[in-house]
Amino acid sequence: MHCAILKAEAVDGAHLMQIFWHDGAESLYPAVWLRDNCQCSDCYLHSAKARKLLLEALDVNIRIDDLTFDRKKVYITWPNDHYSEFEANWLKKRCFSQQARARLQGELFLPECQYWGSELQLPTLNFEDVLNDDDHAYKWLSSLKKVGIVRLTGAADKRGEIIKLGKRIGFLYLTFYGHTWQVQDKIDANNVAYTTGKLSFHTDYPALHHPPGVQLLHCIKQTVTGGDSEIVDGFNVCQKLKEKNPQAFHILSSTFVDFTDIGVDYCDFSVQSKHKIIELDDKGQVVRVNFNNATRDTVFDVPIERVQPFYAALKEFVDLMNSKEYKYTFKMNPGDVITFDNWRLLHGRRSYEAGTEISRHLEGAYADWDVVMSRLRILRQRVTNGN
C-alpha cells in the first residue's frame, strides 16, 4: 500500500485529525488514539513491537497542539511538547472507516471459509514438500484455514512423523493424553477411540474449556476392511440447521452442556467443562462446534422443561450431519496425515474387526490455532514478499 497525503488538519477542537488522501479518500483519527500509539522510542519498544507508554500516563482528553504534514508523514506536537511522527501507509492501513477496518481484520485473521458437503475435493499435498518448502507449507495452512482439512501424503509409516509437523508450525498442544497419542485397539481403553467400534461424529476434547483447535492424524497401519474415516463441515451443517429449524439452532447455541473426561494417561485427570454445542461470536456467526457424545456428561444443568426440547434439537443436528448430502467418507492409507480444524469439522470412524494383532494404528496430536495462525502469517509474509 503506497499512500500520499493531500492534506491533514486538526478538527473537532483538536480532538480529531482529518486526512485527505490523493486517491480521494478521507480518514479521521482520534487524538487520544494517536497519542496512545506514538511510535517514538520513549513510547514504543521497536525491538519487541510493543507499546511502552503506560495507560496511567495517557490523557484521554488530549488535544493536538500543532500539526504539519508532507506527502509521506504527519508530524504532531502535543501539549507537553511531546512529538510524534506517523507514516502515511501506517495511518491509511489503520483508518477507522468500516471498509478499512474490515479489510485489515481480513488480513489479520483470514476469515474466508469455504463450506462443503459430500462433494468435497480433499486438498492434498506432499508431506515432505510441506516440511521443506515454504510455498507448500503456506498452501497447507491457508487451505486448512479456508477449507478446514488438508491431507498430506508420503509420510513414513512409523511414529514421530507428526512431531515434525509440530516443529514446522512451532510446537504441539500438550493434553492429558500426551504430546502425541496412539489410536489403536487397547484393552481397558481409557477413550472410546481406542476401541474397534464405530465412532459417531464428534469434535475432540470439549471437556476442556479451550479445546484444541487443530488435530493431526497420521496413518501408520490400516485395516483391510472397515475403519473408514468420516468427516462433516460443522459450520455448513449449523447453517442448514438454522435455515431448517431456527428454534433447534437457538437451543443448541444458547444451552450450556456439561462435558467430562476422567482417567489416567499422560497423568491422572478429572476434567469438567460447560459449552454451548454451537458457539457464536458477537455477530451471530458460528465460530466453534463443541460436541462429543461420548464425553457429554450425565450431569445436565438445565430446568427439567428444557431437557426434551434439547434432545430433540440435538437429534436433528446429528441427523443432518449423517445425511449423505453433508458427510464425506474416505479411507486413510499408511503414510497419510490428515490435518483438520477441530473447532469446525466433526469426524467419525466406521467400525472394524479386532484381530490377534493390532490391525489399525494412527498417531494423533493437537495444535493450537494461535500457533497455526502465527506460522500462517509468517509464511504469507515470506511467500508474498519473497523473503
Curated annotation (Swiss-Prot):
Compartment(s) of residence: Cytoplasm
Q: Which residues carry this modification: Phosphoserine?
A: 351
Question: What keywords were assigned to this record?
Answer: Carnitine biosynthesis, Cytoplasm, Dioxygenase, Iron, Metal-binding, Oxidoreductase, Phosphoprotein, Zinc
Looking at the keywords, is Transmembrane present?
no
Question: How is the cofactor bound, in the record's words?
Answer: Binds 1 Fe(2+) ion per subunit.
Swiss-Prot/TrEMBL catalytic activity: 4-(trimethylamino)butanoate + 2-oxoglutarate + O2 = carnitine + succinate + CO2
User: Might you give the EC number(s) for this enzyme?
Assistant: 1.14.11.1
Q: Which cofactor does it need?
A: Fe(2+); L-ascorbate
GO BP annotations of the record are: carnitine biosynthetic process
Q: Which residues bind Fe cation?
A: 202, 204, 347
- Annotated Zn(2+) binding lies at 38, 40, 43, 82
The UniProt entry's sequence similarity note says:
Belongs to the gamma-BBH/TMLD family.
The record's section on PANTHER family has: GAMMA-BUTYROBETAINE DIOXYGENASE, GAMMA-BUTYROBETAINE HYDROXYLASE-RELATED
This chain belongs to the protein called: Gamma-butyrobetaine dioxygenase
Per the UniProt record, the source organism is Mus musculus (Mouse)
Gene coding for it: Bbox1
